[in-house]
């Protein structure tokens, strides 16, 4: 495995909005978690990027460069550093196509976006053949067929979480006023936590029983909050730009940063700082919950691997969010 130089292990301090530090002007507490990257990251990134540059219909050379700079395979390799070598490419391709679709949805109404995603659902199941002249259709179909060819049972376990995520993307909840608590409940679906958990299990060939998943419920929810809020903190400038340039519904600003700033009557930068402190508390909470699981004698080998995988998702998400050019308007 490739251990990342842990930029989270030092106190973060930066000034200026969109500088890669979320616009912070004061030191932030260090993360308790250490990111690790999959050892095949360089090879897989090249393979996956080349595939999408060949098959996806990018409207311009600028957008092709922006796609490469976003480094979607890189974040997948940070999410799942313990993925099997013959499965990490599947995970990279799935998250990449979902990111690309997410960008398209910003320029659609919620109704248009819902129709777009709903058309892809039976294609993903293999119930409907794709239109080979439409890249998103055949990319989606071919990916799911190849995943099922590799491990039909575990691939099919990812389907429903993906559909929940896709429907959350166009849920009208996102354009309604929300408090922080209800927002985090919505984001558990929109950030794709169940999707990431199922994809982690597939990528690691990690078999966890339904009973064990129930035991992990609170740990999963805690992780979801961390993923959602870190994403919000570092993507705020990107989402703000989208709210001004994209569709009024698809690009609507839906973020814990704005919600907390409005509720507490504090600045955006102050809201970001408070949210990062909250994430550090969720990291502590994760450690407490894992220790309770161990103390109760309920932590099997599969559960140990699962909860460690959640740590890598949290640390990997933060590492990528702080460095990706997707959130820093360089390209």
UniProtKB/Swiss-Prot annotation:
Residues annotated to bind Mg(2+) 1: 102
Cofactor entry: Mg(2+)
Chain location of the short sequence motif DDxx(x)D/E motif per the record: 102-106
Motif (NDxxSxxxD/E motif): 231-239
Low complexity biased stretches: 7-16
Enzyme Commission numbers on file: 4.2.3.9
Gene3D superfamilies: Farnesyl Diphosphate Synthase
Residues noted as binding Mg(2+) 3 in the record, renumbered to the chain: 231, 235, 239
Pathway terms, separated by semicolons: Sesquiterpene biosynthesis; aristolochene biosynthesis; aristolochene from farnesyl diphosphate: step 1/1
Signal peptide positions (record): none
SUPFAM superfamilies given in the database record: Terpenoid synthases (SSF48576)
Domain of life of the native organism: Eukaryota
Chain residues that bind (2E,6E)-farnesyl diphosphate: 326-327
GO biological process, one term: isoprenoid biosynthetic process
Residues holding Mg(2+) 2: 102
Record function comment: Catalyzes the cyclization of trans,trans-farnesyl diphosphate (FPP) to the bicyclic sesquiterpene aristolochene. Aristolochene is the likely parent compound for a number of sesquiterpenoid toxins produced by filamentous fungi.
Record remark on domains: Contains several highly conserved motifs that are important for catalytic activity including the aspartate-rich 'DDxx(x)D/E' motif and the 'NDxxSxxxD/E' motif, both of which are involved in complexing Mg(2+) ions to coordinate the binding of the isoprenyl diphosphate substrate in the active site.
Subunit structure, as described in the record: Homodimer.
Protein name: (+)-aristolochene synthase TS1
